[in-house]
């Protein structure tokens, strides 16, 4: 008697696909290994390090002033905010935090908020382009061009400014710049309205973002999220309010907070943060008084060009400052600022020489990218692009 063959259903196993690093939605050099069940993501494994340049080690071989430009090149979309964190850390070690001139503090806050608008414009419009809306991207870059002109007029560079330095800022604001920033601020609110008109109530935009990449408040804290990803989950934590630095305690602004913790909430928060940054920009312009823009201590800040050409002592100070740097007392500090992407922190250790003994950089994007696996799980492949866009990842700071 012939045995009946038992028919069993074939076992389908998941397959893996590589997303990036050449993919236009990978936001740089992200390589994702996705485990897929059909069109549904079961697991995502980010492979980082393709933009690793050894920044933290390089800083150990430079003096404190020479190390500053490395911070522009970490998150190369929010440059001055990172210079700001480093400068505050060095000032803490030098014990001069309370001596920074008031005008310099206002200028720092002004350009930190201009940088925040620069970052959020890129984040929102590139996110829209990833999802399929090209027009806001073109509008956003038109406005970013104006902001980069302000960067250029104050520092000579459109991106890597090296403008905020320990002890103050490199140069005073040129004549007419405050008036031009004021004019920009008056018209920029209507540009935000145009972007919102295109996206906020758009049916397709909402279908792609609502209930995608949901992060609960508990998950956000467990994964060390900060910035927009933390506030999108309903936690009103902003270092400018909770741990004010510079003149943020004098500024009136609100912290936008989400309720659902999804991609749509995070989009709305970024748009609202641009409006709040405009409020701060207007306040700094109105309240800024005349005065010196860096500490009057020739061991920490260089003399002006005029002084250098008239006084032999100033020339000697200038030469010694730029060749040997300045000695920082032994100690350590962790200093954080509210960068556009989240909490950007610098852990700086000094051994009493003119070079840092150790500089550990806490990049917000690194923590956010770790959460991609649980955020993308059980979503479609197309939603992964949306989630990466809403995380606002830049690989300069992730890979360092």
Swiss-Prot record:
Gene Ontology biological process: mitochondrial electron transport, NADH to ubiquinone
Recorded family membership: Belongs to the complex I 49 kDa subunit family.
GO CC, any one term: mitochondrion
Known role: Core subunit of the mitochondrial membrane respiratory chain NADH dehydrogenase (Complex I) that is believed to belong to the minimal assembly required for catalysis. Complex I functions in the transfer of electrons from NADH to the respiratory chain. The immediate electron acceptor for the enzyme is believed to be ubiquinone. Component of the iron-sulfur (IP) fragment of the enzyme. Component of the iron-sulfur (IP) fragment of the enzyme.
Enzyme Commission number(s) from the entry: 7.1.1.2
Subcellular location: Mitochondrion
SUPFAM superfamilies associated with the record: HydB/Nqo4-like
GO terms for MF: NAD binding; NADH dehydrogenase (ubiquinone) activity; quinone binding
NCBIfam families xrefs: NuoD (TIGR01962), PRK06075.1 (NF004739)
Stated name of the protein: NADH-ubiquinone oxidoreductase 49 kDa subunit
Pfam families documented for this protein: Complex1_49kDa
Keywords: Electron transport, Mitochondrion, NAD, Oxidoreductase, Respiratory chain, Translocase, Transport, Ubiquinone
Keyword NAD applies: yes
Annotated organism of origin: Prototheca wickerhamii
Substrates-to-products reaction catalysed: a ubiquinone + NADH + 5 H(+)(in) = a ubiquinol + NAD(+) + 4 H(+)(out)
Transmembrane as UniProt keyword: no
